[in-house]
Amino acid sequence: MATQQKASDERISQFDHNLLPELSALLGLDAVQLAKELEEEEQKERAKMQKGYNSQMRSEAKRLKTFVTYEPYSSWIPQEMAAAGFYFTGVKSGIQCFCCSLILFGAGLTRLPIEDHKRFHPDCGFLLNKDVGNIAKYDIRVKNLKSRLRGGKMRYQEEEARLASFRNWPFYVQGISPCVLSEAGFVFTGKQDTVQCFSCGGCLGNWEEGDDPWKEHAKWFPKCEFLRSKKSSEEITQYIQSYKGFVDITGEHFVNSWVQRELPMASAYCNDSIFAYEELRLDSFKDWPRESAVGVAALAKAGLFYTGIKDIVQCFSCGGCLEKWQEGDDPLDDHTRCFPNCPFLQNMKSSAEVTPDLQSRGELCELLETTSESNLEDSIAVGPIVPEMAQGEAQWFQEAKNLNEQLRAAYTSASFRHMSLLDISSDLATDHLLGCDLSIASKHISKPVQEPLVLPEVFGNLNSVMCVEGEAGSGKTVLLKKIAFLWASGCCPLLNRFQLVFYLSLSSTRPDEGLASIICDQLLEKEGSVTEMCVRNIIQQLKNQVLFLLDDYKEICSIPQVIGKLIQKNHLSRTCLLIAVRTNRARDIRRYLETILEIKAFPFYNTVCILRKLFSHNMTRLRKFMVYFGKNQSLQKIQKTPLFVAAICAHWFQYPFDPSFDDVAVFKSYMERLSLRNKATAEILKATVSSCGELALKGFFSCCFEFNDDDLAEAGVDEDEDLTMCLMSKFTAQRLRPFYRFLSPAFQEFLAGMRLIELLDSDRQEHQDLGLYHLKQINSPMMTVSAYNNFLNYVSSLPSTKAGPKIVSHLLHLVDNKESLENISENDDYLKHQPEISLQMQLLRGLWQICPQAYFSMVSEHLLVLALKTAYQSNTVAACSPFVLQFLQGRTLTLGALNLQYFFDHPESLSLLRSIHFPIRGNKTSPRAHFSVLETCFDKSQVPTIDQDYASAFEPMNEWERNLAEKEDNVKSYMDMQRRASPDLSTGYWKLSPKQYKIPCLEVDVNDIDVVGQDMLEILMTVFSASQRIELHLNHSRGFIESIRPALELSKASVTKCSISKLELSAAEQELLLTLPSLESLEVSGTIQSQDQIFPNLDKFLCLKELSVDLEGNINVFSVIPEEFPNFHHMEKLLIQISAEYDPSKLVKLIQNSPNLHVFHLKCNFFSDFGSLMTMLVSCKKLTEIKFSDSFFQAVPFVASLPNFISLKILNLEGQQFPDEETSEKFAYILGSLSNLEELILPTGDGIYRVAKLIIQQCQQLHCLRVLSFFKTLNDDSVVEIAKVAISGGFQKLENLKLSINHKITEEGYRNFFQALDNMPNLQELDISRHFTECIKAQATTVKSLSQCVLRLPRLIRLNMLSWLLDADDIALLNVMKERHPQSKYLTILQKWILPFSPIIQK
C-alpha cells in the first residue's frame, strides 16, 4: 500500500511559457490565462492526492496496465510514462511516480516523461538507479544466481536459521512476510528481494503483496524435495493449475535458457530500445551529415544513435543527447563526462574490469559463495531440461544452438526490422513502431468478454496455438517482429523460455514446401544450412520451447502442409504458435484456438509519438496537428491503424512545405498510397473503392454504420477481396452473422463523398440522377453545419468539373428554402457514432430559437464557404458564379468572409451585399443585473400556500441569482480567455489595390471595450476607407469613439448610423459625432445622461431619418432639442419618450412634417392634446408600426383614427385601458379591417373583456397575424372561442399566442380550451401563465387534455405555464408527451416561478 501521507504544497509548472504566445495563436485563446487556470486546478488535485512510496506500483508492467483507461489524446505514450516510473492515477490526466510521488498532469510535446521527472525530482531514487524495488516490465520472477548457499542445505534446514537471513529484507517488500517465506523453505540472498530455496536451490524475486510463497515454489520448482515433503501432490497440482499464465513452464525453462542479455536492465526506461545493438545504431547514421567531424563508428560504439536532426545523437540507454561535434572529439569521453551515471557506460566499465571488487559485495559474500561446475548439481534438484551433451550423443542439440545464434543475428539486423508499411518509401518503417505498444485485447474462444492486455501479459500467456487478429495494417507484422527482436536481444526475460523463435511469412511459401526450406529462405544466410530431419528432431526435443511467429495467414488450405500440421496437431508437437491473421480470415482457424489476441484501434498517442520522432525538427507543424485533432476529437479515431500514420508521414515527407495536416489530407494521402501500392491491380482497386463508396454513401444518408453480408452484396462489395479490408473491418465476435464497418465513421464519410462525386461526374444519366438524389437528401442548413459538415467538407475538397456547379447550386439554395431552414431534425442513430454533434446541435437549436437572424447569418456564410471551396477545387468558378451572385443578393456577411479568394477575383459582387458585420469585443465586465429591486415589486403578504408535492413550482430568487451569476462568471472566464486576434486584411478582397468596389454597408458592433490599440485602429482605418456606409453600434464602451478619432475623421462622411447603449459620451466624443455630415440614424439608450451636446444640436444632423431615445430617469429630450429640428421633412422612424411637464408641440410638429414616418413608439405619462397627436399620425400614410407605453393613452380618439392606418403591421397597446364597451366594440370591428396586421398586443380593461369574443372572431380576417396577446381580458367562453376560430380556419400563420394573467379562466375553461384547440400549424409559443397568487392545482384530466393539445400543435417549441401546480405524475405525463412531440428536441416547458421569497408549505 502507498504510504498515507498528505501531498505537500509543491508547486509544479510544466508549461513552457516561451511557447504560450504560439499556442495562443493556434488555440485562438489566451494560452497564458489558460495555463494559469489549469495549473491552479492541477495544484488543487495534487493537494488532495496521497504521497509516499507505492509498493503496489513498483512493477512496470502493473504501471503500464493502469494506462488502459488513459485518454488517447496525449503527447506521451504509456510505455514512456511507465518506464519513467509513473502510473496513471485516474484523476484527470494525472500520473504519479511510485517512488518519489511526483504528480504530473501535462504531457509536453517537446519533452519526454523521463525529462520532466528529472527536471522536477532529480533526487528520485528510481532515477538514480538505487534499489527502490522497480521491476522491469519484461522481468521474471525466476532468478539465475550461479551460486549456492554457504554451508549448503544443512545450515538452513531449520526455519529459524532461514528466518534469520531476512534481517535486511528490503522496505519495498514489507507486504511479504519473511516468516512465510522462510516457512516455504526460502533464504534471503541479500540481493534485492531475491530468495533461494535451501533445498532445490531455486531462486525467486520480484515479490509483490498478495503473493503466496508456497504457490510460487510449487509453480516454478515442483520437484523440490522440501516442497514435496511439506505439500501433497494434489496441493502442488492445484497450485500449478491455478497459476495465471506460463502454462507448462517451470523455472528450469528460464534457468537453462540459451538467450542471454548482452546489456543490463539497470535503466528501466530503455530496456527494450532497438538501439541496444550496435549494428542498429550504425544503421541510424545513414543520413548523418557528411561534413561532420566525427566518425559514425565511434558514435555507435559509444552507445549513441542519430536522431535525424542536425548532428544531434542520443544514448539508447540514458537518453542523453550530444551535439555540435568538432574535430578531435571522442564520443565515449564526451558521453562519460556529460552522463556519468549512464547504465550502458557503467556496464562497459564493469565488463572491462578483470578482478571484481570483492569489497562491494558486503553481506552478500557472507551468505553466498561461487558454485563451481563440480558441485553445481548440489544446488539444483533437477538437471537442466536441455543438458549439455557431447556432440556425438546429440547432434540436434548443437544444431539447435547454432540455429539459435543464426536466428538472433537475423532478428537483430537492420534489414529485419526495416520494412516500409505502405511499400512506397522507407520513411516510416517498422522500426519506428517497435517503441509503440499496440492496444491488445484477449478473449477466450467461448467467452464474449474481452480483457485488455499489455505486452508483458501477452508474453506470459503465449501457449500452444494462439492467433493475433486485426485489420489490414493494424500492426500484426510489427507485433510479431517485435517479439522476435525482443527474444533475440535478450532484453526480454519473459521470452527467454523459448530456445528458438521462428518468424515466418506465409505469403511467399508453397503448399509443398518443407519447414527447413522456409526457414533457410527467409531467415538464414546460407541455403540448406539446416535439414528437414534436423528441424523435426529439434521440435520433437524442445517442444514448447519453440515459438513460431506465423505472419500473413490467409486460410488453412493455402499454407504449407507442414505448417498446417503444426496448427492442426499441436497436441503432438506441443510447440507454441502465434499466428497473425486479418479479422476477415480468422474463421477457419478458430477451431484450433483457445485464446485470440485482437489488435484494437491504434491509439492517438502512438501517432503523436511516431510523428515526434520523425518530425522533431518541425515542432510547429506538430503543435498544429495536435491542436487540430484536439479541437476535433471525433477525428482522432481516423488514425485507426499504423497505415494512416504512414500516410501522414509519406505526405509530410513528400510535401514538406504543405501546411495541411487535417483529416482530408490524411485520407487523400492514404488513398494515394493505396493506389501507388496497387498499380498492378489498379482496375480492381478502382472497382473496390467505387463499390465501397456506394455502400458508404447509402449508409451515411440512412445513418447506418454497420453492414451485413447482404448490404455488401447489394453494393457489389467483395468481402473476400483483400483491398476491401483496407477500407473496411469485419467483426464476428458473438454474432450469428458477421458485420462490417468502415475503418472509422469519418472515413466512411470520405468514401461516401468520393462516390457522390463519381456519380455526379459520370457520363451515364442514371448515375447523375442517383447522385442528385443523394445530394437532395441534404435538405437542412443546420445539418450542413453539424451532422453533414464533415461529409460536405470532404465533397468540397474533391475536384470535379461536372459535379462542382451542381453541388454549389444545391448548397446555396438551401438557405432560401423556408421549409429546409426549419427542417432541423436529429437522428439518434447518427449521434451514437458522433455524440459530440449532439451538443453542437443543441447550441444551434438554441441560437435558432433565441436569435433566428444570427443563426441564419451563420449558416449562410458556412454554406457560402463550402460552395466556394467546391467551385475552386473543381475549377468551375465561372460556371458557379451565377449561383454565388444570386446568393449574395441582399445578404450580410462577416468581415472574415472578404478574405475568400472569390472577392478578389470578383470584387464587383460586393455591391450585391446588404452589409458586412464587424464585431469588436473587449474584456470589460458588463454591468450585472441586480434582481434585489424585484423584491419591491412583490407583495410579500401574498406569499402562496402550497402542498409539499408542488414545491418544485417555485425557486428562491437568491438561489437562482447565485446560479445565474456562476454561469455568467463561467461565460466571462471563457470569453476572457478567447484570443481576439485582429482581423487578417492580407488575403482575398484586401489584396486589391486600388479598391474599385467598396463595401456597401459596414456594421461595426462594439461591446465592452473602451480603447482600441494601434493595430486595431489601423485596421479600422483600412476597413472604413473601403466602405460606402458605416454603422456604429456601441455598447458599454466608453471612450471608444475618442480612441478611433483618426479613423472617423478620415471617413466621417460615410457614417450613417450611430447606436449608443449603456455608456456616456465625453464632451469631445459628442463634438466628434456632431461633425458626421451623413448621419441618418441615432439611437441612445440605457443611460441617465442626456448627451448634453448632442440633443441641443440635433439640427446639425441634416440627414437624420431615425431617432430612438430611451433614457433612464425622467428626461425629456424634446425640452432641449432646437426649435428648427421639427421642421425636418424626412423622419422615418421615431422612438421617443416625453414627460408631462413639457409642451408636446415640438413632437406634434415633427410628426406633421414627417410624411414618410413608418415606425412610431411613444412612452409618456401624460399628453395634453392626444387628439392632435392622432390627427398628425393619420397624415403619415406609410405608418406600419405603433406602440404606446405608459398612462397617456386615450381610447376614444385612438379608435376614431385607427381605420386610417391601413398599412399597419404592428399594433402594441400593452397596458393601455379600454374601460368603455362601446369604444371597445368599435375597436374590435376596426381591427378586422386592418388586413396587413401581423402583431396585435391588445389593451386591457373591462371594455376589452366584454368584447373579447368579438375581437377573436374579427381575427379571422387577419390572415397575416403572427402574434396575438390577451392580458387579463379572457374568460372560459372567450378562450374557447380562440379554439373555435382556429378550427374554422383562422390563425393559420399565428406563431405566438399569449394568454397570460387571465385569471377569470377556470380550470374547466382551460380544459375545454385544450380539448378543442387544433389546426394551428405554425404556433410555436403558447403562454397560459398566471400570477403566483392565482395558482391552479391541475387535475389529472386537465393535464392529460393539455398533453393531447400540445401533441396537436406540431411546431410548438415553448409552453409557458407558471402557477400551474403539477405533481410528479403530472410532470411525468408531460415528459412522455415531450418525447412523442414532433419538436421533442426543442420543446421547452416553463413552469417554475422565481420569487424573492419561498412559498408556505402546507403540511
UniProtKB/Swiss-Prot annotation:
Binding site for ATP: 473-478
Example GO BP: negative regulation of tumor necrosis factor-mediated signaling pathway
Domain annotation NACHT: ranges: 464-758
Record GO cellular component, one term: canonical inflammasome complex
Molecular function GO terms recorded: ATP binding; ATP hydrolysis activity; cysteine-type endopeptidase inhibitor activity; cysteine-type endopeptidase inhibitor activity involved in apoptotic process; metal ion binding; protein serine/threonine kinase binding
Keywords: Apoptosis, ATP-binding, Immunity, Inflammatory response, Innate immunity, Metal-binding, Nucleotide-binding, Protease inhibitor, Repeat, Thiol protease inhibitor, Zinc
Binding site for Zn(2+): 315, 318, 335, 342
Tissue specificity as recorded in UniProt: Expressed in motor neurons, but not in sensory neurons. Found in liver and placenta, and to a lesser extent in spinal cord.
Pfam families: BIR, NACHT, Nlrc4-like_WHD, NLRC4_HD
InterPro entries associated with the record: AAA+_ATPase, BIR_rpt, LRR_dom_sf, NACHT_NTPase, Naip, Nlrc4-like_WHD, NLRC4_HD, P-loop_NTPase
BIR repeat locations: 60-127, 159-227, 278-345
Function in brief: Anti-apoptotic protein which acts by inhibiting the activities of CASP3, CASP7 and CASP9. Can inhibit the autocleavage of pro-CASP9 and cleavage of pro-CASP3 by CASP9. Capable of inhibiting CASP9 autoproteolysis at 'Asp-315' and decreasing the rate of auto proteolysis at 'Asp-330'. Acts as a mediator of neuronal survival in pathological conditions. Prevents motor-neuron apoptosis induced by a variety of signals.
Subunit field text: Interacts (via NACHT domain) with APAF1 (via CARD and NACHT domains). Interacts with C.violaceum needle protein CprI.
Domain commentary: Both the BIR and NACHT domains are essential for effective inhibition of pro-CASP9 cleavage. BIR3 domain binds to procaspase-9 and the NACHT domain interacts with the NACHT domain of APAF1 forming a bridge between pro-CASP9 and APAF1.
Name of the molecule in the record: Baculoviral IAP repeat-containing protein 1
